[in-house]
Swiss-Prot record:
Coiled-coil ranges per UniProt: none
InterPro entries membership: Ribosomal_uS10, Ribosomal_uS10_dom, Ribosomal_uS10_dom_sf
GO molecular function: structural constituent of ribosome
Keyword flag Ribonucleoprotein: yes
GO BP: translation
Any one annotated GO CC term: mitochondrion
Chain's gene name: RPS10
Keyword Chloroplast included in the entry's annotation: no
Residues that span the membrane, as ranges: none
Superkingdom of the organism of origin: Eukaryota
The protein's name in its UniProt record: Small ribosomal subunit protein uS10m
Family of this protein: Belongs to the universal ribosomal protein uS10 family.
Subcellular location(s) of the protein: Mitochondrion
Keyword set, alphabetical order: Mitochondrion, Ribonucleoprotein, Ribosomal protein
Amino acid sequence: MTAKICIVIKSFENQRSGLLLNTRKIGLPKKQTLYTVLRSPHIDKKSREQFEMRIHKQLLVIETETHKLREKLNWLKLHDLLGVQVKIIFYYQTRLDKVCKS
């Protein structure tokens, strides 16, 4: 039986996902926020500074056999990415159920 692992990666920098073989990489839309701050607290309203924050998102899909699921999960735990928020979703199929999501 097959299982599918979906990994959502969020980071401030564009990440390389070349660390996994047999994966599909799907680019998700970037979120861009712009902040404008006054430079001086009292006068000079025209003097402002602008800051920008970009959040890059990617979706990685790994299809594997259910008996190799533990190996893939341990591999993902060992090779963690620094400065990245990771959300992992497992889809698997059993003999009794059609499709299970956990």
